[in-house]
Amino acid sequence: MARAVGIDLGTTNSVVAVLEGGEPVVVANAEGSRTTPSVVAFAKNGEVLVGQPAKNQAVTNVDRTLRSVKRHIGTDWNVEIDGKKYTPQEISARTLMKLKRDAEAYLGEDITDAVITVPAYFEDAQRQATKEAGQIAGLNVLRIVNEPTAAALAYGLDKGDTEQTILVFDLGGGTFDVSLLEIGDGVVEVRATSGDNHLGGDDWDERVVAWLVDKFKAQNGIDLTKDKMALQRLREAAEKAKIELSSSQSTSINLPYITVDADKNPLFLDEQLSRSEFQKITSDLLDRTRAPFQAVIKDSGIAVKDIDHVVLVGGSTRMPAVSDLVRELTGGREPNKGVNPDEVVAVGAALQAGVLKGEVKDVLLLDVTPLSLGIETKGGVMTKLIERNTTIPTKRSETFTTADDNQPSVQIQVFQGEREIASHNKLLGSFELTDLPPAPRGVPQIEVTFDIDANGIVHVTAKDKGTGKENTIKIQDGSGLSKEEIERMVKDAEAHAEEDKARREEAEVRNQAESLVHQTEKFVKEQREGENAGKVSEEILTKVEAAVKDVNDALAGTDIAAVKTAVEKLGTESQALGQAIYEASAANEAGNTDGAGNDDDVVDAEVVDEPTDSDKK
């Protein structure tokens, strides 16, 4: 049976976990780290770098390095590199492919299936796009699971049969969620969820960048935002400062040679940022987490005093101001410190993968839809069929009728959101039910059915009860990809994987060739100038040198087959050289033996002749 993994595809970092003997294990990547930066870079030589290698070269390759792409997933955003446009799904797929590759290296077997997590407040288009990213990466996405739900699953599964209420406060690199869940007797049920898809650690970093830019401009009159390379260095320094301020009261931000002045003199940036100043310039960001928290308490109908455990998820919750706020909101309750906020979501995803593959028994995960779903009816009103925080999977139907006499068709427009006017909500998609028989208005019976699967992905059907005619739409946002596009991207990704493999093989061949050339040149020099000089004929040495030249000429070109051929030829000539050296040495030893007579050293001479004696046996 193929192995399944759990993947936390994050805005800034991603994690993969797998079940080993029923226990979840976080897999370290090829670089030895348990978290992989969600960064993809297109190097000038055509190589695609993912993770830490991509992050390391970001300063010198700003325009071709992509980060925080998760913020764009489910939209029509794209980026053009070397004349080719890439969607967020394709870029995210690169990160997923690396995680898949690292997990396969760890397990020693292929991985085909995965559970991928998304922020609880992700809309339908964002969920659909995440699933597409998995497909492009060559994964069968078993389930899309909400991040707080996965975290609660990882945290609460070993807490016994007693029913408990868990608040998950999830502040990642680019998104924020807060969820209230009940866990007991193997059932994990989400009671309510809320959040902000555009709030995360990146925003804290940008505030520090803006603060540094203002300080530098005041001192030097130069706007660093105009310099892409300087801006990238500022972002990296801001992230580092934010992390340091989680454990220190102040941090030094020192960037030498950040730019030059009008006279081409180098300028340096050197600032001290205190924790209090950092909290001051980011206080409004922190305040944005309050409303979703209050909404969850209200929607769930559970009082703050009845919350048993508070779990912090996401690296951004390490900021002291965040944990202080959570303590304040929960009436002084201390957040649980027993989980790793960076890894707990991937661990929960691996457990859910185990549930779906039958490796983990007696666990039921009941998730909810984060936003209400409905259609636009007469007057532009949003008529909700499924209210937010409804447990999924679910199916709801409602019957509508026509607004005009002899209306030949009805347009079904599907919206997601909480506003009373449909146009103020997010349009997920629309379709038409046509060829309705002529009838007075109010007579036709149009049954609209909403069906949300366990991934939170919506299917809508409209059916004319009179004729039985129906039309169905699987909600696919304007940014959604067709089946053909996904297949094309899968092939592109596979081809790129082959390219990467070929590039690695080429590098190995070149390295071996260069090493062989170096060793052979050294060997030839020793035969000409060393203590054994003159023992091998010049003809053999000349042939070896010619073969070395052929390898060097091939290395200067791009034909890897020519390099292999030249290396084989050099190998043959090197063997001939080795044989000549051996024969010369043997002849020399034999000469020494003949000249020794009946000297006492004759015993030693017999040792040299041993191979000849053994051949006779």
Swiss-Prot record:
This is Chaperone protein DnaK. Keywords: ATP-binding, Chaperone, Nucleotide-binding, Phosphoprotein, Stress response. Residues 597-617 have a biased composition (Acidic residues). The modification Phosphothreonine is found at residue 175. Residues 588-617 are annotated as: Disordered. The gene is dnaK. It comes from the Bacteria. The keyword Protease does not apply. It comes from Rhodococcus erythropolis (strain PR4 / NBRC 100887). Belongs to the heat shock protein 70 family. It holds the Pfam family HSP70. Induction: By stress conditions e.g. heat shock. Acts as a chaperone. One of its GO terms (molecular function) is ATP-dependent protein folding chaperone. InterPro entries: ATPase_NBD, Chaperone_DnaK, Heat_shock_70_CS, HSP70_C_sf, HSP70_peptide-bd_sf, Hsp_70_fam.
